[in-house]
Structure formats: structure tokens, C-alpha cells
């Protein structure tokens, strides 16, 4: 049960930190240099996680277990990084951009979850989707 709550808490706080730091990245810095430093630090942090999640069967064995998803995740992460750096440089507000992208991405993933992962959707879920759509309209309403 600890992992259930810890994992979502980590994701929430990391996402908030991510958007805060992306918005705080100087607008005059080169995107590539910024992300190069980001990924170098991330590499070190990931290496440190071996303390908590040690390799049990050897690195070669673990590498053989990987599939296309690791490459896809890398491409997605770079797209997210560049996308948000550009979004914030273009003048989007922190709260609006984060909510908009997460809600729209979630809406895109609903059919993916249903058709590729055979997840079920209830009427309550459908109502939640409609609330999300209403929220998007309200977020982008001209003031």
C-alpha cells in the first residue's frame, strides 16, 4: 500500500517541480544546452536510484528485457521538454499550460486505454471526461 500512495505523490510533486523549473528556465539560454545539463543531472540521479532498486540479474539481462517503449519514452520526454520550454517562452501561464496539456493528453489516452490496454470505462468516467472538457472551455474563456 505504501508504494501505491508514494508513487502517485512522487509523480504529483515532481510534475509541479517540473513545471516550476521549466517556467523558470532563462529565456535567453539555448534549448539544447539547457536540456543537455538537465539530462546529465537526470543521468546521475537515475544512477543513484540503483541504491534503492539494485540490478538482480545483471545489466545485460535487464537490457535484453527492454522493448520499443524505452526509445518511445525518450522521444516523448524530449518532446515534452522542448514543448514546455517553447510554451512558457511563448507566454503561456504556468497553471493554464500545465492543466491544458495534461487534460488534453488524458483525453487522447482514453481511447488508447480502451482499445490497446482493454481498460474499462464507466458512466462516471464519461461524466468526468465531460467535466474535463467543460474545464478546458472555462480555462480558455476570454476574460
Regions found by a protein language model. Name each.
Residues 1-13, 27-32, 37-71, 81-90, ...:
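Membrane-interface interhelical linkers
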Residues 9-13, 40, 71-75, 99, ...:
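Residue-level signature of the transmembrane alpha-helical core
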Residues 12, 16, 20, 47, ...:
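Hydrophobic/small/kink-forming positions within alpha-helical transmembrane segments
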Residues 23, 85, 113-114:
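Small-residue-mediated transmembrane helix hinge/kink sites in multi-pass secondary transporters
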Residues 92-99:
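The feature identifies polytopic integral membrane transport proteins across all domains of life
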Residues 106-123:
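C-terminal transmembrane-helix exit sites in multi-pass transporters
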Residues 124-140:
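Hydrophobic transmembrane alpha-helices of multi-pass small-molecule transport proteins
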